[in-house]
């Protein structure tokens, strides 16, 4: 079969989550990562090359810490009363299935049509149902009209929203500011935004737009979770910061 756009890199990260789930003291449990790997093989998809897999394994502590941080972000958003969530470029992370969502939560996942089709077919074939009250996949190209497609799918622009942008910014051809302009335009006060960013540019911009921002560096985050990085992890996270922002006006 033709491999959907974005599926190879998503499978590489799924392999890292599958490995963490079987660690002695895992930061999270993702039983669905193996579902995607098996589904890819059964469909004739090519798994990531040995070189790609080795690169992912080399930053395993970083990747696991990143997943844990975004998991905690969504759990905290729900605890603070937010009921509308959006994951931009969701990939093959099955948060809609594996996190303990507050009743009444709606989760929108935006990604390439092929990625979402593969993801939902694999989980349906395995008999899995989302744990979130309402799950809405939004097939869209992030370079063209994604916010309109999100609204067409039922997104409420008047409701405070928790956004997540994970593992995406290096692939945004036009730079991040257009993406964050769109998010800002449709996020009322009380909305939250979690971003994996390189450097402080995103945080600085959000601060000028009425968002209250906190940051933590990748090395500090790995230390918090007891995942001290090796040389590969250190290189991967050298300039990476995790931005947590709340819109105040």
UniProtKB/Swiss-Prot annotation:
Keywords: Methyltransferase, S-adenosyl-L-methionine, Transferase. The keyword Transmembrane does not apply. Transmembrane segments: none annotated. SUPFAM superfamilies: S-adenosyl-L-methionine-dependent methyltransferases. This is Putative S-adenosyl-L-methionine-dependent methyltransferase Mkms_0592. It comes from the Bacteria. S-adenosyl-L-methionine binds at residues 111, 141-142. It is an enzyme of class 2 (transferase). GO terms for molecular function: methyltransferase activity.
């Amino acid at each position: 079969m033709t491999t959907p756009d974005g599926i190879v890199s998503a499978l590489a990260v799924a392999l890292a989550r599958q490995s963490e789930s079987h660690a002695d003291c895992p930061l999270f449990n993702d039983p669905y990562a193996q579902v995607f790997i098996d589904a890819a093989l059964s469909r004739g998809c090519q798994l990531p090359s040995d070189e790609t897999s080795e690169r992912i394994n080399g930053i395993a502590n970083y990747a696991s810490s990143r997943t844990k941080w975004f998991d905690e972000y969504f759990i905290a958003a729900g605890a603070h009363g937010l009921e509308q969530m959006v994951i931009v470029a969701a990939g093959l992370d099955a948060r809609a299935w594996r996190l303990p969502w507050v009743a009444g939560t709606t989760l929108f996942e935006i990604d390439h049509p092929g990625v979402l089709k593969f993801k939902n077919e694999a989980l349906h074939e395995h008999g899995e149902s989302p744990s979130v009250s309402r799950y809405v996949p939004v097939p869209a190209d992030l370079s063209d009209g994604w916010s309109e497609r999100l609204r067409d799918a039922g997104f409420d622009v008047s409701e405070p929203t928790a956004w997540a942008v994970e593992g995406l910014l290096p692939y945004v051809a036009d730079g991040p500011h257009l993406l964050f302009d769109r998010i800002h335009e449709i996020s009322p006060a009380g909305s939250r935004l979690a971003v994996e960013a390189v450097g402080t540019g995103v945080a600085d911009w959000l601060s000028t737009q009425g968002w209250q921002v906190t940051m933590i560096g990748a090395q500090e985050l790995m230390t918090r979770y007891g995942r001290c990085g090796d040389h590969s992890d250190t290189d991967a996270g050298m300039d990476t910061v995790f931005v947590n922002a709340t819109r105040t006006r």
